[in-house]
Swiss-Prot record:
Induction: Induced by treatment with salicylic acid (SA) and osmotic stress. The keyword Lipid metabolism applies. It catalyses: (13S)-hydroperoxy-(9Z,11E)-octadecadienoate = etheroleate + H2O; (13S)-hydroperoxy-(9Z,11E,15Z)-octadecatrienoate = etherolenate + H2O; (9S)-hydroperoxy-(10E,12Z)-octadecadienoate = colneleate + H2O; (9S)-hydroperoxy-(10E,12Z,15Z)-octadecatrienoate = colnelenate + H2O. Expressed mainly in bulbs, and at lower levels in roots. Keywords: Fatty acid biosynthesis, Fatty acid metabolism, Heme, Iron, Lipid biosynthesis, Lipid metabolism, Lyase, Metal-binding, Oxylipin biosynthesis. Signal peptide: none annotated. This is Divinyl ether synthase CYP74. One of its GO terms (biological process) is oxylipin biosynthetic process. It comes from Allium sativum. Divinyl ether synthase involved in oxylipin biosynthesis. Catalyzes the conversion of (13S)-hydroperoxy-(9Z,11E)-octadecadienoate (13-HPOD) to etheroleate and (13S)-hydroperoxy-(9Z,11E,15Z)-octadecatrienoate (13-HPOT) to etherolenate. Catalyzes the conversion of (9S)-hydroperoxy-(10E,12Z)-octadecadienoate (9-HPOD) to colneleate and (9S)-hydroperoxy-(10E,12Z,15Z)-octadecatrienoate (9-HPOT) colnelenate. Pfam families: p450 (PF00067). GO terms for molecular function: heme binding; hydro-lyase activity; iron ion binding; monooxygenase activity; oxidoreductase activity, acting on paired donors, with incorporation or reduction of molecular oxygen. Its cofactor is heme. CDD domains: CYP74.
Amino acid sequence: MSTSNGSTENIQKPLRKIPDITGTPILTAIKDRLDFFYNQGQYEYFQSRVKKNNSTILRMNMIPGPFASNPKIVALCDAASFPTLFDPSKVSKVNSLTGNYMPALSFTGGYRVCAYLDPSEPTHTKIKQVFFNAQAAKKDTFIPTFVSTFNSMFDKMDAEVESKKKAEFTKFNEAAVFEFVGLALVGPKPAREVFDSAKKSVFFQFHPFITAGLPALVEELAFHMFPFPSFVAKSSYKILYEYFSTGGSWILDNAEEIGLSREEAIHHLIFTWAINAYLGIRTCLMRLFKWIVASGPDLQEKLAREVRSVVRSEEGKITFAGIEKMELVKSVAYESFRFDPPVQVQYGTAKSDLIIESHDGKYQVKKGEMLCGFQPMATRDPKVFDRADEFVPDRFMGDGKKLVKHVLWANGYGTDAPKADDKICAGKDLGVLVGRLLIAVMFLRYDKIGGVVGKTMEEVDVIVNELTKVAV
């Protein structure tokens, strides 16, 4: 039996029984799903159960549950136990992207795409190297493409705020992110029908995790209980296939050189682009924008001053070198990842009987159990971060830089760099970069951004009602 310990404390800890709150089969899992989606929200769902049972490691139910998947998981809700999920000797990532739920393979051409592969599988290393090569080939286009795309987005937001006195950031952001990902990572600008097809593909595969503002009973019966058959996505997937087979042909050429067939590679590419890259960047920027607006004019003034000073020193351009000089911008981006992670759960299956350590105890997990790390509680762990439940913009400046390691996301520590043979997201560095680029673009344009911000973690949208342009 192996031991997994994410804590740096070298103390003897007691072996404790994991509280089991899975309850009555089916009934408790359905009740818990209602709590997760409608009664509590996901943060309160985990936090209340941790508090009630006085344990950050729990056997509990997780969505989607009946009848789409087995709801039982072992929850890891602190910074000590969470990194168990990063250790390939202890956990398997085979088919565990979304826990015990997995859409039919027919959604992805009959292939298990990279997100469902374990690093030990040969195809995983090959396709991940293809992604690295594609990023390297397009590296010089990232910044100019982002700046152009998001300046265009803010032009449209300016017009809407002027005409309607408000603008919904999510609507503009998702279209801009889609365009950026297409231009920066593939090549040709994706048409509107490609954008719509990607959104449909995401919904048809992952509807058990989605709410759409409909009555709970309707969503439960329509979305959450049973997976959709793949034929509902056939026409939209065909549009994605055609876009990537032509626009991404240069990536498919490289895949063939590495030893993958074009047919298999295109399905990996579609999933990684439409799910991992598009959804990941969209969510990252929405949450970052929310907390910058919520923080108000004092932080915005400091960010504007830093951004403009550095850009002046870089001959008026946003550059990689300049972005690295923006210490407050970097800290704010990392604090957003810490405080409100873009991906909030990570999974892995125990490869053998394990002893997992929290800060104050040891817990035995059986081989084959699904482990579910709830990231916001791990990255808001008060044993690691002071003022853990506050958004602290300068947290990672000066001596605080050493805490970046504990910003756990993308299947690794904050300081980990992805490699072809590990499970760290291939676009991890790109995620941090685009957050910093958004801040730079914003504060070269505006002195102040105001809006209505949701109070809970689930309320990510911002209704913008003020965009004060830089005084000329």
